[in-house]
Each structure stands twice: as structure tokens, then as C-alpha cells.
Amino acid sequence: MVIDTHAHCWGPPSEAHPWTNSQIVGGSDEYASGDFLQDFTVDLVYTGEKLLADMDRLVVEDAVVVGYPICPWTDNWYTVKVAEEYDRLTGVVMIDQFADDAVDQLEDVMSAEGIIGIRLGAGCPYDRMWQRFDPTVDWLLDAIDETEFWAAAEALDAAVHIWTLPPQLDQVVEFIETYPELTYVIDHHSYIRGDVRPGAEPFEQLATLAAHDNVLVKLSGVVTLSDEEYPYSDKHDHVLWLLDQFGRERIAWGSDWPNESNDATYLETLTWLNHVDELSQSDLEWITDRSFRQHVGMD
């Protein structure tokens, strides 16, 4: 079996759910604005049904739909919809933990069938969430003070997915050390690019996280992060370093599809792992299936 731990899909724009993210959307629709990433090779409305069809062609059994911020970033309607509608899809949503009703929002969305956790876009300015990346922002440290929210997340078994840029890993370390009972997933292995070699500072920070058994690292976004063509050989020693530090039980493959569709096929987002010569078949089975299910309690 194979689970894609990081995929995206989204519904059409409407009055209730307008497309508003200027970095993603475009066209003349009444509810859309900005410049769509025309490089995508998938349909502009890439629904759960289309994702499932692509999964079937790749023989991916299940996928985690990470909320796609094409609408206002806290609008989780479509992620919840597909998680409730399809047994093969689960969902990760985004909530403003600083909102007055944040706990109520969390309790409501976690009650939906198939929702397994929340995502923090710690690499984005809070007022430009998912519209711009900025390695200098530090609102994650302010989020530490939202104690009631994180207590609710722990009570609800909400896995906390954190997307961050390498210079912000010290914030992630402080956050995790403050709330050691939560379950954590580090998206895109903290966006470490292929030209950064193991031993550099980002890897030292990740090594600190490896000491926490409740932290899993996603081996996702590799097509974007690599400076080379398939099979992305500059990322191979990153895989081996993660394997050594975290063990295969805490590394999980994710495609970041269809964000990668401008440079790779869905198949290539997975099969590059077969070219990491030192990985055993058992390692691959853990990384592409067992590790994530075990980590978030899906097994």
C-alpha cells in the first residue's frame, strides 16, 4: 500500500467560497482575482475526483488532502467535503489560532469525518498567509501563548503540521519543546533545498527535532526543492541523513501534487525514491506507507 501524505485538491469558486489568493488564482470569473499559476498541467478546478483518478493511475491507495489556500486561507470547506465524502482521502485544515473562537473552530472541524489535524504556515507573514514566504517572520513564537488552543488540539488528537523555512527552525524547536505531548509533522522537511548539504545549520536544527519521538518529517516537495532533474540526486543524501536521524518510522513520502505538475509527473514525485540506492524495500514500505499511518494513528 502507498499513502500520499501531501496532496492538494480544490473546488470551483463561488460567492460563498471565492478564489482570493492572488498568487494562485486568476481568470475572469466573478469570484476570482489575480494570476493563476498557468504552469500547472492539471485542470484549473482540480477536484477530489480528479485527484483520486490520478491516484488510481499511480496505484496510490490513500492521500492526505492538505488544505489548499485558493480561497481565504481559513476556509476549509472543500478539504472537509472530500474528507467526509471519500474514504481514501483524509484532511488537514488551517485555523487562525489567534481568533477569539479558535477553540470552537477547532472542535467543530475536528468533529468532521476524516480530518486528522491542522497546518501552521509559519513561513508566511500572518497578514499575507500563503501569499508570500518570509524567513524572518516569527509569529509562531506568539502562537505558543495560545495555551487553550493547544490544550484542545492535544485533547482532540489533532496532528500539528508545521510548514517553515530553514531559518525559522529554532522557532519550531521552541514550540515543540513547549508542547511535547502534541503530535507533529514537519512539512516539506522544512524546505531545505538540494544545494544545502547535511552538516549545515538547517540539518543541525532538524537533528534537535529528531530527539522528539512525536515528530515526523515529510519527504515532500522534492521536485521544487531539488536543483536537478529527475531523479533529483541532490536530495538523495538528504534522505539518507533523515533516515539516520529519524529512522524510517518517522519519515513519510508526500507528492505535493499538483504543485509539482509543472516540472514532474505524479509518478515521478514517487519513483525518484527508487533511485536512492541505499534504501531497502523495507525502508520504502515504511516511508511510503507505514510511518505516517502509525504516527497519526491511522493504522
Please report, for each region that a protein language model flagged, where it lies by residue.
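Hydrophobic faces of well-ordered beta-strands that scaffold small-molecule active sites
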Residues: 3-7, 63-66, 90-93, 116-120, ...
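Mid-to-C-terminal alpha-helical segments outside catalytic/metal-binding sites
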Residues: 1-5, 14-57, 62, 240-241, ...
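Divalent metal-dependent hydrolysis catalytic cores, especially in the metallo-beta-lactamase
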Residues: 29-44, 49-71, 88-94, 116-123, ...
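Catalytic pocket-lining loop regions of alpha/beta-barrel enzymes
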Residues: 136-252
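Acidic-and-aromatic substrate-binding clefts and catalytic sites of carbohydrate-active enzymes
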Residues: 42-45, 67-74, 95-103, 128, ...
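Short, electropositive alpha-helical surface patch
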Residues: 78-87, 176-185, 238-244, 267-276
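Active-site gating/metal-coordination segments in enzymes
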Residues: 70-167, 174, 218-222
